[in-house]
Amino acid sequence: MTEPLLTIDDLAVSYRARRERRTALEGLSLELGRGEVLALVGESGSGKSTTAQSIIGLLPEGGRIDRGSIALRLAGGPIDLARLEGRALEDIRGRRVALVPQDPGTSLNPVQTIGASVAAPLRIHRWGRPEAIRRRVVELLDRVGLDDPERRARQHPHELSGGMRQRALIAAAIALEPELIIADEPTSALDVTVQRRILDLLDDLRGELGSSVLLITHDLAVAAERADAIAVLRGGRLEEAGPTRAVLEQPASRYTATLLADAPALADESPRVPRPPAAPFVVVERLVHEYGRGADAHRAVDDVGFGIERGTTHALVGESGSGKTTIGRAVAGFHAPSAGGIRIGHRDVVAARRDRSLRRVVQLVSQNPFASLDPRRTVAQSIGEPLQNLGAPDGRRLDRRELASRVSAAIAHVALPPDAGDRLPRELSGGQRQRVAIARALIIEPAVVVLDEAVSALDVTVQAQILALLERLQGELGLTYLFITHDLAVVRRIADTVTVLRQGRVVETGTAEQVLLRPRHDYTRALLDAVPSPDWLRTPSAAGIDPTPLEVA
């Protein structure tokens, strides 16, 4: 390791939880070298984000540093960030230490222009006059690869794609050329090609600025490909730390070995063996969906068709803006397409879209269960709500005792603890909330489940558990899945058949084995090449194609 820029020594952090305090970090000690990347890896609740918040002085209400030090070594000598407060902390934040948060959708002010958001650290630190700041903002947006930066500076967040918004956050973070950049899950919600561009950008900027990067991630493949060193956290404690190759080649901790085993990878076992052909149960025919009208119309889905056999999993794969979610919501009956048809068995989904009975046939599980669950209702109330609204699968209205019995059975079916029904969503982990969303979808015994990025935000261990759960339920209940994802390693594990989308059109479709092992289209090959490899010895090869133009909004 080079001379350390950041040294964390015996850090302990706790949060107020009702009438007691809950320990979030206990005795954490780490070092990050100058100009290096340290990946902080662990599952949800391991303390990764708490570590970042402690460094930058942004612990949420009720959080406090109980002991330990966080030494940032600057030219004038080391500064203990754990002891800073008020103006002294504000002077460091943004100027010496900057944060790239996970979700640009919530981190950018929706009523502010992109230019105003990028300019915020420059204004706070009185970098220059308004005209000089305006020029600096345009320069920064250009530096992070946004086309037509002057126009982008005038736009609002909703006018940019997810990758473009993430670039804007990076522009704000590097505005004052800080010594330390904390990247908190900066690519977990992005598709593989945009993810690669964002990580390449961070690498380039690190080289230009000489900054160190603390990369917080649950993706071991990203850590393996990008980090000089890895630190593994579990339950607020450090499991192990060391050079990337040493940690991944010879993990000292059984927990690290488990994380490595759970990480989905294209190099893992072969895709599912193709089944003998059968008549499709779900049929999507020449689907078209347009947003807006007239000259402002945007065709998000253009002549898409595919079929799904009963009891199988069909994956829809593509970048942001490829039309995946639009198709999934149409199959679930949430909106009518502009043209084309959708059938489930003998039922016309488009014609039956407003029929409540369609909800018995097809259910949707979304990416963010926290947003889809009522925060004021208990888990049992949320799971039981579809039964209360629609009745039992045979149409009967259930009395309170039978409803409670079915909810308890649903909770057990998705392997949640028996007392989970009495909890609120905020009292559950991310993986537990996703299990609640699955139980809620399955309690009325649908034939088809649309899973829209249902595991993309979960750490590898929880992701593996949810995928195993979905496979078990499919085998027990004969479910048919439409699985929407940007993660090709997950597709390899769970899908029987695959359709690859690009800008609303089908690029290719076939069995998982055909598409993943023998892709016919350059775009599919480029998507496969962009997947971070968990093999830390692999040198990424160039596919010779840029899968899409730079994120176009």
Feature names for model-found ranges:
Residues 238-242, 250, 506-510:
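ABC ATPase "signature
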Residues 65-79, 340-348, 358:
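Conserved ABC transporter NBD signature motif
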Residues 168, 174-175, 442:
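ABC ATPase C-loop
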Residues 56, 60, 332:
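Helix-to-loop junction immediately C-terminal to a conserved catalytic motif
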Residues 155-160, 164, 424-428, 432:
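Conserved ABC ATPase signature
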Residues 132-151, 401-419:
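Conserved ABC ATPase "signature" region
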Residues 94, 158, 176, 444:
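Conserved signature/switch motifs of ABC ATPase nucleotide-binding domains
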Residues 77-98, 124, 246-251, 294-298, ...:
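ABC ATPase NBD coupling module
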